[in-house]
Amino acid sequence: LRTNGLKYSKSIFTPVLAGQTDHDYVLWGTWPDGEEMYREYGSFLNDYKNKGSINPGICHTNVAFFNTAAQHLRIPLEEYDRIQMADFSSCKFTEDSSWEEILSLAAESESANQELGRDGFGIHYLRPYRGFNVDTPFDMVRMIHYYNKEKRAEAVASWPKVRDYRKENGTAEKWGQHIESCSPMKLYSMEWIYDTR
C-alpha cells in the first residue's frame, strides 16, 4: 500500500455485547475519500500478488458506507487504548427527514457535550452506499466509539446530566423529527490493524 502511495486503514471489530450474530468479526476499511477508495481497489485487483491464497477466515458480505464523522471530542493520542469500544445502532429516517438538519443537530450535540465537560469519544453516521439490497431495513448506522475504557465509563456516569440537558432543550423531539427509530445498541471491540493514510 505504502509503495503505491495508497491511503487506507484497516480495523477489526469483534462482538462483545451484541446478542446473537452471524459473524465472528467485521473487517473495516477506511479511505480519506471515494477517489482513494477506488484507487486502492484498482491496485488490489491489478497489482496484488497473493490473490487466491488461503485466508484465515471467509467474509460472506462486502458493503460500502458513506462515513460521516458527525462528532469528535478527542483526547491526546497517547491516552488511546489499543483495543477500543464501539456501540452500533441502526436507524430509520422519517419521511420528512433532512440530512442537513441531522448534521446540524450533531453539531449542537457536540457543543453541548463540550459544555457538559464530556470528551473521549466520536460519533459516525454510516449511510449505505454499495452492496446493499433495495429493501435494506435501515437508512443509517450510528457508531459511537470511545478512545479508552475510562472515557466509556465516564460516559455512563455523566448520562444523567446528558438526559437532563436533552429534556431541557427538546433534543429528543428535534431528533424525532428526522429519526423514526433506532435499534438497541450493540457493543463491539475495535482494533486498528494498519494505517497508511
Predicted features, each with a name:
Residues 1-50, 55-169, 173-197:
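Short S/T/G/P-rich N-terminal loop/turn motif that feeds into the first structured element of a domain
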